[in-house]
Amino acid sequence: KYFSLGKIELTDAGGNPTGVINPNEFVFSGSYALKLSQTFSMGVSIKYIRSNLAFTGTSSTLQPVNSFAVDVSGFYQSEEENYGTFNGKYRLGFNIANLGPKVSYVPGEEDFIPTNLKLGGGFDFILDDYNTISTTLEFTKLLVPTPLADGSEEDTSWISGVFSSFGDAPGGFSEELKEFTYAFGAEYLYNNAFALRTGYFHESEDKGARQYFTMGAGFKTNALNVDLSYLMNASDVNNPLENSLRFSLSFDLGEIYDDY
C-alpha cells in the first residue's frame, strides 16, 4: 500500500515560505489465515512500514522512519439456525492492528504507532432465499498511553503502553469509556446481488468529535462488484470527508474461474 498527500507548501504567520512537505507512507505486508474449525478462524499479518513526512524546516528536521508491525485477528460465525419465522446466524470478531515498536521522526524522541483494538459483532436475519437483513456493531480503542501534561507517558515501552492504555486516563473510568469509538450499520441484501446500506460512527466530543452518518448501495453480477457510499457529518466539528461520495469497482477472479 502507498499513500501520499502530495506536495504541501508551508508558510509562517507573515506568509513567507518555510518549506515544502510531501507526506507519504508505504506498507508491505504478508498474511496467513487458518480455519481452526467450521465456525472459527484466525489470521496474522506482518508488515514493513516506511513513513516519510519529508519536511526540512528552518528549525527542525523530520527523518523518515522504517519499522514493522503485526496484526492479529479472529473471526467466529455460527451455523445458520431457525428462529421460527426466519433463519439467522451471528458473527463475532476481533482485530489488534499495528502491534510494533515506537518510531523516531526526530533524533532523541520516540512516538507510538497507532496500535488499536477492534471488537465487533453482527447478526444476519435470513428472511427467505432472496432477502437478508444484516446488522453490525463495532467498538474501537487506541492501545497507546494517554498523553499527559508532564510527558511521563514517553518513558513507557510500547508493550507496556498496550496494557496501560486501559487505565491511564486522567479522568478515570469515565474518560476511558470516552476513548472508545463505536459504529453500527445495517444492510438489506436482495438475491445476493443488490444491497442497500446505512450506518453511524461516533467519537466522543472530548476525543476528536468525529460523528457521521453513512448511506450506500451495492450491485453484483457474476464477477463484477459496484459499490457507492455517501457520508454526512453529524458533528459541530468539520470533517474533511463530509458530503463525500465514494465509488468502488472490483472483480472477483474466482467467479470467472468457476464459470469455466
Where are these regions (language model features)?
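Subset of outer-membrane beta-barrel
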Residues: 1-260
